């Protein structure tokens, strides 16, 4: 759909279209940190991206939409267990979509969170080289970043939510 729109309209008009999504500010009820780790090693080639795109079904999109809405609600209400559950569930849906999304390095990025008060998953943006984390403890964020460094993963971004 987007390719057709881009061919027929200028970028400003394309951006103004209703894509069925919305961007809104999310006010979190709790003190969380958001971290992005970079493995420096894309796992997905152009061919793999096309394969993943062809695997995306309406069922997958509906499941992910439900997860996102549940996550949004959990963050607004400060429900840590639901936040963790939804991040994990989203990561599992990405794995089911295409196991190759999780490179060995991305698996390490997620496994580094073990025994910490954090949750992690692939960013899901398509390159297979970044993971995102929600941390519920500044101390655990520091421990996680050190674990990442020890396996060559770089902290790309960190902010408080």
Per-region residue spans from a language model:
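C-terminal nucleotide
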Residues: 1-125, 132-161
């Amino acid at each position: 759909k987007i390719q057709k729109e881009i061919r027929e309209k200028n970028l400003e008009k394309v951006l103004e279209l209703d894509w069925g999504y919305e961007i809104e500010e999310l006010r979190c009820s709790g003190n969380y940190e958001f971290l992005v780790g970079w493995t420096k090693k894309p796992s997905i080639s152009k061919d793999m991206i096309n394969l993943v795109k062809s695997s995306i079904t309406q069922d997958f999109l509906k499941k992910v939409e439900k997860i996102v809405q549940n996550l949004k609600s959990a963050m607004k209400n400060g429900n840590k267990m639901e936040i963790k559950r939804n991040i994990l569930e989203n990561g599992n849906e990405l794995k089911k979509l295409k196991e190759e999304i999780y490179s060995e390095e991305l698996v390490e990025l997620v496994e580094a969170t073990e025994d910490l008060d954090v949750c992690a998953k692939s960013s899901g943006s398509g390159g297979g080289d970044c993971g995102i984390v929600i941390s519920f403890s500044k101390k655990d964020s520091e421990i996680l970043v050190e674990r990442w460094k020890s396996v060559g993963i770089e902290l790309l971004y960190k902010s408080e939510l």
